């Protein structure tokens, strides 16, 4: 009986240690954007990855919030406020910003609501000083280096992987960095499932399923189901961290085959009103256009 009591006490002690360790490992929440970005400081990334940073700076990931102000504004003002009569909370805002600015996961409730209000101001009060000031702050929020290489790196199978380690850089190879930072190999980063966390069906923390776009659906149900094997990264990371898509003319040329057949002919106008000479041949043509979708999903899609 004494041994059983000791084992029970030891088990409880170990559980308390684990709970305590988990509590200590939980990252703090930021009360300002400055504090938030300091927690996930990416300024040193460009020192070693200058070319990658330059590519990313020209990508839509770099402006993922300010380029989507209209949609997020409508979610807050029309969806939450009018249709669902639901207050703006961090949990609700994350239904947009968990993808458009994953660092918001580490914002306090107060800061998250302030950011939501900034989005409304930036879109609603166009050309005003308040809108300009809000946009300047919102432009600092995006899908940056640590969004993919840390925050979302373990989310494909979080129940198995657990949350990303603070300060760890996850990459497809896990290369040594000569002490620049800790690196851990993650096979998830080269799988389509990684991209589909956001470019597909999103599962919110409250259980709501959100289908902002149908891209992953057509990829899985049409391309993969019919024997396709390429991943999102095979096409959209081919040029590096520009992540080109439908906005890039070279990517469009690669993804869409275009053939045009023109058959010229002549015809008589017949006895139509306004025809001066019904025996004068009229030059005409039949134009047939063939469009071939070479991508792994519907085009257009989003």
Which residue ranges define each predicted feature?
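Bacterial N-terminal signal peptides that target proteins for export
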Residues: 1-11
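Short intrinsically disordered, low-complexity coil segments enriched in acidic
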Residues: 2-3, 24, 242-243
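Bacterial N-terminal signal peptides
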Residues: 9-20
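Intrinsically disordered low-complexity regions specifically enriched for long asparagine
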Residues: 18-24, 299
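Sequence context of c-type cytochrome heme-c attachment sites
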Residues: 24-189, 196-226
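Catalytic cores of secreted or luminal carbohydrate-active enzymes
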Residues: 225-302
């Amino acid at each position: 009986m004494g041994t059983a009591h000791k084992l029970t006490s030891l088990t409880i002690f170990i559980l308390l240690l684990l709970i305590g360790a988990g509590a200590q490992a939980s990252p703090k929440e930021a009360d300002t954007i400055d504090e938030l970005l300091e927690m996930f400081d990416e300024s040193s990334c460009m020192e070693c990855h200058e070319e990658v940073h330059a590519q990313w700076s020209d990508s839509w990931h770099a402006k993922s919030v300010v380029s989507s102000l209209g949609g997020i504004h409508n979610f807050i003002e029309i969806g939450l406020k009018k249709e669902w009569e639901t207050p703006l909370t961090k949990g609700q805002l994350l239904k947009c910003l968990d993808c458009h600015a994953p660092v918001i996961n580490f914002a306090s409730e107060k800061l998250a609501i302030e950011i939501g209000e900034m989005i409304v101001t930036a879109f609603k009060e166009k050309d005003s000083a308040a809108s300009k000031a809000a946009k300047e702050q919102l432009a600092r929020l995006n899908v940056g280096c640590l969004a993919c290489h840390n925050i979302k790196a373990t989310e494909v199978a979080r129940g198995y992987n657990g949350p990303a380690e603070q300060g760890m850089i996850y990459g497809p190879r896990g290369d040594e960095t000569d002490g620049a930072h800790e690196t851990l190999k993650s096979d998830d980063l080269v799988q389509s499932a990684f991209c589909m966390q956001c470019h597909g069906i999103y599962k919110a923390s409250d259980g709501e399923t959100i289908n902002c776009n149908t891209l992953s659906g057509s990829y899985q149900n049409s391309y993969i189901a019919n024997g396709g094997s390429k991943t999102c990264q095979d096409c959209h990371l081919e040029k590096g961290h520009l992540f080109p898509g439908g906005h890039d003319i070279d990517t469009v040329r690669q993804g869409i085959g275009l053939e045009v057949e023109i058959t010229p002919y002549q015809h008589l106008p017949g006895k139509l009103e306004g025809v001066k000479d019904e025996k004068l041949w009229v030059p005409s043509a039949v134009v047939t256009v063939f469009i071939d979708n070479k991508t792994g999903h519907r085009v257009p899609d989003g």
